[in-house]
């Protein structure tokens, strides 16, 4: 999603089609119970069944405490409600890797170890939903000539590959660093903010 910060108008959106329901059923049958992001009655929410949450999911939810998008539901069927656009699975690699292999060619999938919690994640999105695709559309809308990006995870790789310059924070995933123009200070050291302060007038 790309949203105008002032008007809160959605500028770019990519939703799953109804085939996502069969994906969710497949996850459930493999004892994987995700957090599902959707627009429900025109309001963004992320839904989950608390009793099905893994330790990693509970850690994530704790980090989002107070988030108005939080939507705890009581049944798996409720995870299918609304216009789904993003699925997050946080579970054991032996459960997630086969699902990544199964869906990586049909959807935009990111399989990675979270650099902050060391938990294994599988993210599933519509095929068109990537940072690089969103940036291409924004570049066209804004008539941008130069692209500088910052990142820390494997889901930033496609964005790094298309940028004029790309900067990975020191605590970034090692797979991302190999695509970086330069490695800057870590998130804990406010690396991005410090880089912008030093370079934004160039």
Residue ranges with predicted function:
Residues 22, 37-150, 154, 159:
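Conserved acidic, metal-coordinating active-site core of Asp-based
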Residues 3-6, 10, 118-121, 176:
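A short acidic, helix-capping loop that chelates divalent metal ions and anchors anionic groups
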Residues 1-42, 139-148:
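Cytosolic catalytic headpiece
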Residues 26-27, 101-102, 175:
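Alpha-helical scaffold elements within enzyme catalytic domains, especially in hydrolases
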Residues 135, 146-181, 185:
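Acidic, Mg2+-coordinating phosphoryl-transfer loop and its flanking beta/alpha structural elements
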Residues 174, 185-202:
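Glycine-rich phosphate-binding/hydrolytic loop that grips phosphoryl groups
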Residues 25, 136, 193-197:
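Predominant activation on well-ordered alpha-helical scaffold segments within soluble catalytic domains
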Residues 12-14, 52-56, 127, 186-187, ...:
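Short, hinge-like loop/turn segments at secondary-structure boundaries
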């Amino acid at each position: 999603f790309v949203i105008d910060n002032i008007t809160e108008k959605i500028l770019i959106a990519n939703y799953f089609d109804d085939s996502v329901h069969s994906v969710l059923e497949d996850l459930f049958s493999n004892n994987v119970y995700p957090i599902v992001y959707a627009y429900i009655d025109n309001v963004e929410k992320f839904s989950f069944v608390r009793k099905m949450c893994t330790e990693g999911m509970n850690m994530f939810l704790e980090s989002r405490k107070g988030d108005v998008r939080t939507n705890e539901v009581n049944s798996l069927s409720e995870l299918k409600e609304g216009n789904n656009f993003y699925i997050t699975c946080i579970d054991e690699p032996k459960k997630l890797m086969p699902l990544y292999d199964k869906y990586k060619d049909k959807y935009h999938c990111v399989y990675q170890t979270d650099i902050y919690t060391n938990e294994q994640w599988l993210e599933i999105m519509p095929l068109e939903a990537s940072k690089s695709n969103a940036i291409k559309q924004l570049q066209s809308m804004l008539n941008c000539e130069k692209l500088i990006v910052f990142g820390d995870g494997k889901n930033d790789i496609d964005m790094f590959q298309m940028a004029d310059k790309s900067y990975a924070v020191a605590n970034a995933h090692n797979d991302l660093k190999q695509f970086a123009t330069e490695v800057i200070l870590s998130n804990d050291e406010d690396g991005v903010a410090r880089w912008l302060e030093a370079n934004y007038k160039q």
